[in-house]
Amino acid sequence: MELTNSLGLLLGSSWASGINLYLTVAGLGIAHRMGWIVLPGNMDTLAHPLVIGVAMLVYAVEFIADKIPFVDSAWDSVHTFIRPAGGMALGYLAMVDAGPAVQYPVAVLTGAIALDSHLTKATSRAAINTSPEPFTNTIASVTEDAGVIGALYLIVKHPVIVSLLVILFIVFSVWFLKNMFRFLKRVLKGKNTRPTAELAGHSFKP
């Protein structure tokens, strides 16, 4: 693969893995089998029918779980290790022919990108769950899946564009995560202090 194509594949797939690992794996595998893209190294393992089938099956479970308030956050918590590990695996498989000197750093990089997109997703979902509106989770979930599908399309058709978008996302996520952690901290602090304040108010009643 050309450098731009390889970079687009690595950056795009690692970002998408942090959002929805199973849809990413299935999408890349199908794209390879259809001849839309040639996956490098041992990454063509994703095109095995069993891998695609298992990925689609687990994606079906995630498709439902991801739209239920608080269940989505529990699912994200479980995947805090799985999604970055999946991103690392994709980088490792793609660079198997380049040797350990390249393979390991690339795997760490793709894992870090997957962790970044996962934390952004998980944090935004935790913030959304503070809202009583039940349809917000569904909208967020559909938007995320659409983003993954869009990233897979750009990996195949416009690798340079997906590379630039991932870089911009990383820059944005630094600001976003910083502010969202502050927001969630204030929300949790408010929930913890409210009962104490109410108890104190009752204790001083005559």
For the regions a language model picked out, list residue spans one by one.
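A cytosolic-side transmembrane-helix exit/cap motif
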Residues: 43-50, 95-105, 122-134, 181-194
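Small-residue-rich segments of transmembrane alpha-helices in multi-pass membrane proteins
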Residues: 80-92, 136-150, 196-202
